[in-house]
Amino acid sequence: MFRGASAINLDTKGRIAIPVRYREPLQLEHQGRIVITVDIQSACLLLYPIHEWELIEAKLLKLSDTDKTQRSLKRLLLGYAHEVELDGNGRILLPPPLRQYANLDKRIMLVGQLNKFELWDEQSWLQQIDECQETIRSEELASNERLADFSL
């Protein structure tokens, strides 16, 4: 399970180093293989360990190619999907189209989301946090069916 936000740097070759605490689980459970694709609702990237991505692919396979919305979803997620492997230094290469999609420059945030990571431009991440906090403050959580019984 991946949790927490880590500030990392994008090097001049377009690589990022995965934080050390995640490398061993990624190597042992997923052979160091990760699939990177776009988030369809935010300007960030999604990084799935290979076995998690295979579950996503099974769901995508069930979508219709004749339904415009379903086909569009498949086209975006699969069209941008790029499999990478951790190198000996725990780095992965982010292809240019993916870096452009998420406006990634030097400072990046890698954010654990349990079964995957989100990869954000640092400033976009800070803005997103503000938006999330505003959403939580403005909505009555008890009126949200899935959150009504959620407690910390």
Swiss-Prot record:
Major localisation:
cytoplasm
Q: Where in the cell?
A: Cytoplasm, Nucleoid
- CDD domains xref list: MraZ_C (cd16321), MraZ_N (cd16320)
Q: Which GO terms describe its molecular function?
A: DNA-binding transcription factor activity; transcription cis-regulatory region binding
The record's section on Pfam families has: MraZ
GO terms (BP aspect): negative regulation of DNA-templated transcription initiation
What name appears for this protein in its UniProt entry? Transcriptional regulator MraZ
- PROSITE patterns to which the protein is assigned, alphabetical: SPOVT_ABRB (PS51740)
Q: Which UniProt keywords apply?
A: Cytoplasm, DNA-binding, Repeat, Transcription, Transcription regulation
Q: Which InterPro entries match?
A: MraZ, MraZ_C, MraZ_dom, MraZ_N, MraZ_sf, SpoVT-AbrB_dom, SpoVT-AbrB_sf
Q: Which GO terms describe its cellular component?
A: cytoplasm; nucleoid
Q: Partners and quaternary state?
A: Forms oligomers.
Q: Where do the SpoVT-AbrB domain residues begin and end? A: 5-52, 81-124
- Please state which protein family the record places this protein in: Belongs to the MraZ family.
